[in-house]
């Protein structure tokens, strides 16, 4: 993959583990963004030692703004995200999960909001929940029904709070957001620009583990 030519404004973080089935859709949604040039954003994809055909899928992508890294061993999601953030160039950072995808104006509108609203240190967008076949299920308010992704942060503010906590194997995004909001403001874009895929292998369907980490989160 070629090196990016200019310093991008936005770094998109994708961490993937055995999501070869979904990763192409995710990347194509990000590589076909409107109203923003490719050199104005980068995509950092960290594969957490997948055992499926993820690497084979990625060989089809030669875009100048896509950087791919493979962990030598499985590090887990929080450590992989932190690794990507530390390698990022952009002043804004946003996480997109590898089984999800975004609207074509997602990056443009997120950047525009932060450029115009200096009092906010991040912006969250509403999301549409979709099924395996991308059939619409529901429109969700990201401030009331929070998910870990689709929030664009000013990067220095993420470093200010210490990035993701590796002890949270689930609900890591909610834990980060809780710490972030103690010091910083998150704005709200009432547009379903993020597409959250609800499928049979989705991590958030493991209710037993969710309850464990929710209890841990509530103690903080």
PLM feature spans:
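A conserved acidic beta->alpha catalytic loop
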Residues: 29, 47-56, 73, 97
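Short aromatic/hydrophobic "clamp" motif used to bind/position activated sugar donors
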Residues: 93
């Amino acid at each position: 993959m070629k090196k990016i030519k200019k310093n991008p404004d936005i770094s998109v973080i994708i961490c993937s583990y055995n999501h070869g089935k979904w990763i192409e859709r995710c990347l194509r949604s990000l590589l076909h963004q409107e109203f923003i040039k490719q050199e104005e954003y980068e995509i950092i994809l960290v594969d957490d030692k997948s055992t499926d055909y993820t690497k084979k899928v990625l060989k089809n992508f030669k875009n100048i703004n896509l950087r791919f890294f493979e962990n030598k061993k499985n590090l887990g999601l929080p450590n992989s995200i932190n690794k990507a953030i530390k390698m990022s160039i952009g002043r804004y950072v946003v996480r997109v999960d590898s089984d999800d995808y975004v609207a074509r104006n997602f990056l443009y509108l997120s950047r525009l909001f932060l450029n115009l609203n200096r009092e906010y240190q991040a912006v969250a967008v509403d999301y549409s929940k979709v099924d395996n076949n991308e059939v619409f299920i529901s429109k969700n308010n990201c401030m009331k029904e929070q998910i870990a992704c689709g929030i664009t942060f000013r990067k220095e503010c993420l470093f200010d709070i210490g990035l993701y906590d590796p002890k949270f194997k689930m609900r890591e995004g909610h834990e980060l957001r809780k710490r972030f909001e103690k010091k910083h403001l998150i704005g709200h874009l009432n547009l379903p620009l993020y597409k959250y895929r609800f499928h049979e292998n989705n991590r958030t369907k493991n209710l037993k583990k969710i309850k464990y980490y929710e209890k841990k989160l509530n103690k903080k």
